Amino acid sequence: MKATQTLIATTKELPKEAVLTSHQYMLKAGLIKKLASGIYTWMPIGLKVLQKIQNIVREEMNKAGASELLLPSVLPSELLQETHRWDKFGPELLKLKDRHERDFCYGPTHEEPIVDMARDTIKSYKQLPLNLYQIQTKFRDEIRPRFGVMRAREFIMKDAYSFHENSECLHNTYNKMHETYCNILDKIGLVYRPVRADTGAIGGDNSHEFQVLANAGEDIICYSNGSDYAANIELATYAKPDLSTRAVSENTITKIHTPNIKTIEKLCTELDFDIKKTIKTMVIKDAKGNFFALVIRGDHELNETKINKLEQIVAPYTLATKDEIFSIFNANPGSLGIVNCPVQIIADYSAMMIEDICCGANEDDYHFTNVNWGRDITSYQIADIRNVVTGDISPDNNGTLELTNGIEVGHIFELEDVYSKPMNANIIGQDGKSKPMLMGCYGFGVSRVMAAAIEQSHDENGIIWPETIAPYQVAILPINYNKSESVKQTADKLYQELLVKGIDVILDDRGARPGVMFADADLIGFSHHVVIGDRLLEQGLVEYKNRKTQEKQEIRLEKLFDILA
């Protein structure tokens, strides 16, 4: 491609609304252009990167035995009403009416239309398993779209849906998709981790997220430094301590006056307590109106997902109000504790390992010290109810846990019959009986992974693409292209030779100043730069620069082909 034949729309201005580096660079490099909040035009060079990602996704999905199709982007309300998602989806669902006043929506996801197609065409177990995928534009009316294509209202996604007769078959395909997603991200060239994830409202036994590691990631993931264990913060757990090893204290429980001390931080600062010897007591109310006291170490945080999964608690739970707490404890938040607690106590394992605890006395302006489990509190239950922290022992007892930020670019689920059952997508099984098909679903954020790649690899000058998705592998940057015949001839000849070899190349024939060409090449992220000028040509040389390493060298043109090989 010649630069004059495409649209290079770089700008020096830093958009005010762009916070993330990926958003800033995608706008500055002219890869996207904002049309409305959370809606972007894909400019030619940005689209080229997007298409390279799509090609990798297609290649690996096809290798895995999946077949591509394309579902409508506008969906009739009747389909989503069958699964009750027409109302459940809420304001993120963009609803519209046609001229006949019939209700439609712009597809935020495509479970219902794929099941509708399947129930009309798949009748027997003999047609299964079947894995179908599409690469489709979707729309979710986010209340606050931000971060560019990372959290846009309109986005491009690969979604696949598999159909099965039994759980074993479903699990086999799930594992195949797990492997396929790893292959996709390996081929793109990203540093990532597959992590176990909460199945949420979808249910089922298996769910994995694919997280690209980046400081700008909104998700917190944890992994073991001694094994392949990895999970997101919602699901991550730790090796349970042996409670029998807890030290037995002979110190006497003591009540101390603590006026105006309502937080753990103030307690530790003013009275010089070790925060790891304190506990937090938080009161919740479950869906049936039952109250519980949740107890964690003072430096830990509650995990909402784990709490909602406890057998004792009817989800969803809410935090008890100040009035509710006072009516039960005759004390206010900040003074609550575990001695003579009037509601059922559920304590985290780490809280159970503390001896000589400092906690609220269930009396305003007072705390207890030297509180010990078993002696001072005899009625309690134990559960994992907190977020893991760096240094926790991995649940497989191999290594310790570390935390990092990630950008979720893929998510796979075993749906089972969550959609097929309410939509009557049945088949005749091997036993001759009718039953719902089992399903898996596998989402991959095609446009999001592009932003994730930038977050993971950039410098102060611009984007450093993994070479497999760089818009152009080689940029020819001729100085005085329109003035020097020798420069023009050399540049044109090299351009044709690279095209013949199948190398993705762009020739900057705009006649721009050298500084502009170099800055644009760095900003957009062309992988290899070849600078052609009269001075070096007189010696039979050109300047070569590797965008990733910033290494420059003066080489003969024939050596360039060795570098690119």
Curated annotation (Swiss-Prot):
Presence of keyword tRNA processing: no
Reaction it catalyzes: tRNA(Pro) + L-proline + ATP = L-prolyl-tRNA(Pro) + AMP + diphosphate
Domain of life: Bacteria
Classification via Pfam families: HGTP_anticodon, tRNA-synt_2b, tRNA_edit
GO cellular component, one term: cytosol
Subcellular location: Cytoplasm
CDD domains xrefs: ProRS-INS, ProRS_anticodon_short, ProRS_core_prok
Entry's EC annotation: 6.1.1.15
GO biological process, one term: prolyl-tRNA aminoacylation
Keyword vocabulary terms for this entry: Aminoacyl-tRNA synthetase, ATP-binding, Cytoplasm, Ligase, Nucleotide-binding, Protein biosynthesis
Listed GO MF terms: aminoacyl-tRNA deacylase activity; ATP binding; proline-tRNA ligase activity
Domain remarks in the Swiss-Prot or TrEMBL record: Consists of three domains: the N-terminal catalytic domain, the editing domain and the C-terminal anticodon-binding domain.
Subunit field text: Homodimer.
Similarity comment: Belongs to the class-II aminoacyl-tRNA synthetase family. ProS type 1 subfamily.
Listed name of the protein: Proline--tRNA ligase
Organism encoding this protein: Francisella philomiragia subsp. philomiragia (strain ATCC 25017 / CCUG 19701 / FSC 153 / O#319-036)
Source lineage: Bacteria, Pseudomonadati, Pseudomonadota, Gammaproteobacteria, Thiotrichales
Gene name, Swiss-Prot/TrEMBL: proS
